[in-house]
Amino acid sequence: SQVVGQVFSNPQVLILTAAILGVLGLIPGMPNFVFLLLAGGLGALAWHGGKRQAAIAEEETPAAAAPAVPPEAQEASWTDVTPVDVLGLEVGYRLIPMVDKAQDGELLKRIRGLRKKFARDIGFLSSAVHIRDNLELKPNAYRIVLKGVEVGNGMAFPGQFMAINPGRVNGPLNGRETTDPAFGLPAVWIDAGQREQAHALGYTVVDASTVVATHLNHLILSHAAELLGRTETQALLDHIAKDNPKLVEDLVPKLLPLASVQRVLQNLLDEGVNIRDMRTIVETLAESAEQLTDPLELAKRVRVALSPAIVQQIYGPVRELDVIAIEPELERILTQSLTAQSGAMLDPGLAELLSKRAAEAAKQQEDHGVPACLLVPDMIRTAMARLL
């Protein structure tokens, strides 16, 4: 019965059978009437069966999809708003293998290491570096962006090496002359076969991945304050609160809002002071916040509390410091001119002379292998730092 049902439910089979019977009905000597009658009946069944299957197929077929709307004709939505990366690295197509995980990109590994080192040395976890290719760049070019704004760029040549002249080399090298993007030193891109010669002449030799990574690290350090946003500040306080919950609770928001704490930390980072010792920072802020609210003044208090660590960061564990001092009379003039309470202004000629003499003294210190450090009264320290 299933076979019969399948046969009579298939219009194609019925049509074929009707055609065969119709041909037989036309042959002389055959029972023509019977064959033609059967052919007509099967043809009618095939016609009705075809209509029924078409109706079923129409019911089961989903409605045709609406024609696609061109992107430019669609209404704007929040999905069109693309967040700006806090920190990004864009590379030309020849540098893609350096950052491609599938190709075991060496630069990718170095960037991960840089972020970990930054967290250990500076004291907070910065935003991840978002890496993407940019076909608008030259094939060997790269650029570093901070909040959508370019802060650095350069060229790198995979397979070649940058020979950097530290200032004392014994001869020139053949290659593509350039400048070290991180520190501005003269350099040359050389082939791998020239590495030993470059080392022998006194050059510092690094590969392409190291060039880009060093440049990126230099810019991250110099823009540390901008990388410390509200999210990073809150995460930093939450991290400290795991071991010192009461300390953080007493500070934020009871004494200071989160924005003020962020600004204090940014002031410290702007002046090259790391914020690793958050316990001392939070304690100092809690002690000072009842008398002070200005983030700049609070940062000064924190600097004093961190002074042993700041000195050791510059000089190492030494008991005597070799510093540059200012003559008493000049110090008096500067104090009168640079303090906020005084209406006097620093004479432009004196400012130029001061900058020149300070640069000369700093060079002498550096030539003797000593950090350049100028000793000034606390009340003019910030102004002198900006001036010099």
What are the language-model segments listed below?
Residues 33-37, 48-62:
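Juxtamembrane/interface segments at transmembrane-helix termini
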Residues 1-47:
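Transmembrane helix-loop junctions at the membrane interface of multipass transporters and ion channels
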Residues 56-388:
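Membrane-embedded alpha-helical signal segments
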